[in-house]
Amino acid sequence: MLELVSVSHIYANGVRALDDVSLSIPRGMYGLLGPNGAGKSTLMRTIATLQTPTEGSIKFGNIDILQHPEELRRKLGYLPQDFGVYPRVSAYQMLDHLAVLKGIASSTERKSVVEGLLGQTNLWAHRNKALAGFSGGMRQRFGIAQALIGNPELIIVDEPTAGLDPEERNRFLNLLAGIGDNVVVILSTHIVDDVADLCPRMAVLANGRVQLEGKPSDLIASTRGKVWKKTIDHSELDDHQAKFEVISTRLFAGKTIIHVLSDSQPAGFEPVEGGLEDVYFSTLSTLRRAA
């Protein structure tokens, strides 16, 4: 269990990136959903001991990670949003080098670990290829391979599917699902479907605060009977936004489909089965209206 209590982080320029964040994250896949600039990457870096919060405490099991960050690092696998590699080095060589840095001194043990990870991430056929020649999806799979060195108990992946094509995204999410049963895996993303497809529990982070937390199914149930849709001309959008709590819009065949949140059915609207996307957008809409 990962426990965060009243974690805040204020940068030197006065920006409060995290504001009183408290979370209990159990074993399994946990989704952290939020827009760009919500504070997700700051929170991931803080949990990964790359920066110290201004206030609050973080514990992983019996480890106080603020007091003993080196203990957490021995149990941590981290795939940041952006990571660099030596472009002319092969995947095999790079994983072997990283395994040495992780403390695996035995060449026989490293060989077993590296070959196993290359197979697990479906990169064995590309083991001798220079990393510079990897596609975006292959780079992300390499990233999770390096994060799995040393059998970590806590794995953090930050925006892992951004920029991947649908096939690579599905392959990567299937890989995550396969490792998420016995360890804590935090999936930080702005892509709703990533969380909906994988995570038994989730939180919505926006403006540096936890706005919503729970099981996706429970959060979806909270909007049941409250989400309505209507197809309008784009020229009518401003008028509808003034009259209703519009939580999402999308273009389809030259028309605009809007979803609104209302306790009763507005005239001209039809009911729609709400999903996690409606929960997410309604949360952000409420914040915008309160600003």
Where are these regions (language model features)?
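Conserved structural motif at the start of ABC-family nucleotide-binding domains
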Residues: 2, 17-18, 73
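Walker A (P-loop) phosphate-binding loop of ABC-type ATPase nucleotide-binding domains
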Residues: 35-39
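Helix-to-loop junction immediately C-terminal to a conserved catalytic motif
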Residues: 48
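Conserved ABC transporter NBD signature motif
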Residues: 56-67, 71-72
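Conserved ABC ATPase "signature" region
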Residues: 96, 100-103, 108-126
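Catalytic Walker B motif of ABC-type/P-loop ATPase nucleotide-binding domains
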Residues: 155-159, 164
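ABC transporter nucleotide-binding domain
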Residues: 171-259
